[in-house]
């Protein structure tokens, strides 16, 4: 494929070394690493099984929706993880019960399936379940928790226990999910979610896990960073890593360029334009961009993406945009204007051939997604962008930094 990415079919287990320090200071209280693995997304799994996505209804093309806790509605937005490709591992309880989770900057709550989930929910049958009776450190809370997705509702109740993440143990309130829709979660490689957002995004105002880690004073800096391997197409390859308390210079070059957040409470920054080739095509008057580790693709409003796809000559196929594979290498660069710099993706970064599809058509890792106010309308920069640019989330200074990944 002349260097451009082929999407993997395999599911992988995580290797997590909380105290691994290759290339980092030997003080284990300074940095903590979480190693990630790459997996097929739920959407890929559905397509591989021959599921007609059009029959699932239009809600499957809307990856975002408002959330609610009990009778209160939050303006927070959370992905439905249809296209999520990276997961890591945490332990909950004493002794730790291990779960594969998505680390998501677009949300702030932690949740995993509960042993109290009825076997009538097929998704629970296919996932690891937290059993409070097996944990000596468990504390009951019981507050009802409901996460409303565009593809269904995940609900349960809050509990408290010790969570181990990256070698750090922290007492954390989390959701035990007792109701999960079969689709999409039955096909998910991950069990649950660890939100890396702010308390303003947290359903029920539950203190996010990173805030609780910071309160222990075990990290050198109030930051965490994400690296997604651009060459993780085989089972032996590291999918990526998260560094708590800093960044890993082994995986980026040069210095970070920082952009201040629009406001405290959401990982969202201003954007000054989107260029195709040498011409600014979109966002000429300025717009917003979420930096979302829970999403695989880059997304923008339907009107923006339709204009972008017209410029690229791409055609819509159900919920994707495709081009002829032999045309992929000739597609122009796409640049995102952030903080006075242009962050450029070549066609090798945003065009891929799906392993289950015809070799004649290739998919663009760019989707339309209409996010309502107050967070939207906004672009979202997911793994397609983060694979190219190592990303640091700076809580102390309310900013996001980018450096060229390698």
From Swiss-Prot:
CDD domains: renin_like. GO terms for molecular function: aspartic-type endopeptidase activity. One of its GO terms (biological process) is angiotensin maturation. The active site is at 104, 292. It is found in: Secreted; Membrane. One of its GO terms (cellular component) is membrane. Transmembrane segments: none annotated. Its EC number is 3.4.23.15. InterPro entries: Aspartic_peptidase_A1, Aspartic_peptidase_AS, Aspartic_peptidase_N, PEPTIDASE_A1, Peptidase_aspartic_dom_sf, Renin-like_dom. It catalyses: Cleavage of Leu-|-Xaa bond in angiotensinogen to generate angiotensin I. Interaction with ATP6AP2 results in a 5-fold increased efficiency in angiotensinogen processing. The keyword Nuclease does not apply. Residues 1-23 form the signal peptide. Residues 24-66 form a propeptide. Glycans are attached at residues 71, 141. It is an enzyme of class 3 (hydrolase). Disulfide bonds join 117-124, 283-287, 325-362. Belongs to the peptidase A1 family. Renin is a highly specific endopeptidase, whose only known function is to generate angiotensin I from angiotensinogen in the plasma, initiating a cascade of reactions that produce an elevation of blood pressure and increased sodium retention by the kidney. Interacts with ATP6AP2. This is Renin.
